Amino acid sequence: MTSFSWPRGPPPPGPRCLGWTVPGCFPCGQSFVERNRPKTAVLAGGGFISLEMAENLAEMGVEVTILQRIPQLMNPLDYDMATFLHSHLRRKGMHLRLNTAVAGFRQEGETISALVEGGEAIPADLAILAIGVTPENALAKQAGLALGSRGGIVVNQRMETSVPDIYAVGDAVEIPHLVTGENTLISLAGPANKQGRVAADNICGGDSRYLGAQGSSVVKVCELTVAATGLNEKAAQAAGLSYEKIVLSPLSHAGYYPGGKLMTMKVLYEKGSQRLLGAQIVGHEGVDKRIDVLATAMQAGLPVTALKDLDLAYAPPYASAKDPVNLVGFMAENLEQGVVKQFHWEDVAGLPRDGSVTLLDARTPGEYSGGCAEGFVNVPLDELRDHLGEIAPGKPVYVMCQSGLRSYLACRILAQDGYDCYNFSGGYRFYESVLLDRWTRQNAYPCGVERP
């Protein structure tokens, strides 16, 4: 049985009408676009399908509005990582309506309006629903197959169902998550194809086993690549795991070779065991390569510190001598050995500004003048040793720079002089992305609404 997952339909009110489609009947939507040439489109949902559709519609000159019930797009990402995606789409001219739940749809002549909670109606020539999928289990129910808590078909490692001689694979089966061990639904083509091979082997008398998946995924959104594997922070917290996180912004290849592009990486590992729990990467080049290495290391059971020793291919056009994956291992080892302590963007607002701690920004004056975190005083790294006598002893020192490297070096200088210091994870670039996204959400107005 190779049941699929079915796109969720619209909430009422919302009769099936000409102006909207779900990705499950994409040929209908494609012919609608070709026939009617819509000028505006509203997309409900913020996952893979919605974003890929949004990109293609925008390329055709359609004005796109994306509605998402939660504060971010791309649920496999944490909010802080998703902010880079939000900024990219806004720069492409798309309208993001986050924290906006669709309550229904209303047909008005040739226009369809998305009705959002709170009463607002958003008119468009085309509406596309991509608000998630549910397992297609109707046949499984008729056949008396056992279903799991998520509505998927229960199978063992041989892909056998609860009924002898019936095998099931694909989107509608519940499989073990390789990180948590809990059964889950992973609607991706990679796992489905591997399950099919296992089932076929066993049907033909073999003894193959499918152990599970960790949800490795990648998607192209305009010029940006977004990838994830394993757990994000939300999932790790829900699983009750104690974890540490590492954020870095390396170049896709050696900095002295032209054309390198920044990527932002976030890696989670379990405290104590150092077990890799998950990774997220957003960038332009080399994203898929790094997520695949991290996914392989996770499935192989490597501890996070083992990443520093991976012998990865290097040439200036493709990588750095210390690959971004190696850097994750170096940074984790520094944390585990107590070489450095860190703080995160969500900690910044709670830092006292009463003089009981010292807040330093180790960037250049030019970088600092372009924006800084409140209360952080500019002492460039190259001048830090000249100003050590001006930094109050006995007070914790929190240090920030653009990416996290110079602030780390500043922390090493300070620690060697007896200071208790903390390095900002991800750098000001990461912090600024989160703050800009929050500011935009608080100050943005729907199209056609005048600012007061």
Stretches with model-predicted labels:
Residues M1-G9, A44, I122-G132, G196, ...:
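Short hydrophobic core segments
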Residues R8-V62, H95, S149, V155-Q157, ...:
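Glycine-rich dinucleotide-binding loop and its adjacent helix/turn
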Residues P10-P12, F32, F48, D80, ...:
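Residue-level detector of alpha-helix initiation sites
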Residues P23-P38, E120-D201, V293, A297:
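FAD-site-proximal beta/loop scaffold in flavoenzymes
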Residues F48-R106, S187-A192, R209-A235, V434, ...:
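Rossmann-like dinucleotide-binding cores of NAD(P)H-dependent redox enzymes
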Residues M60-Q157, C447-P452:
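A Rossmann-like FAD-binding core segment of flavoenzymes
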Residues A172-E285, P316-S320, P324-G350, V357:
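Mid-to-C-terminal Rossmann-like scaffold of FAD/NAD(P)H-dependent oxidoreductases
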Residues T305-P316, S320-V357, P365-P396, Q402-P452:
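Rhodanese-like catalytic fold shared by cysteine-dependent sulfurtransferases
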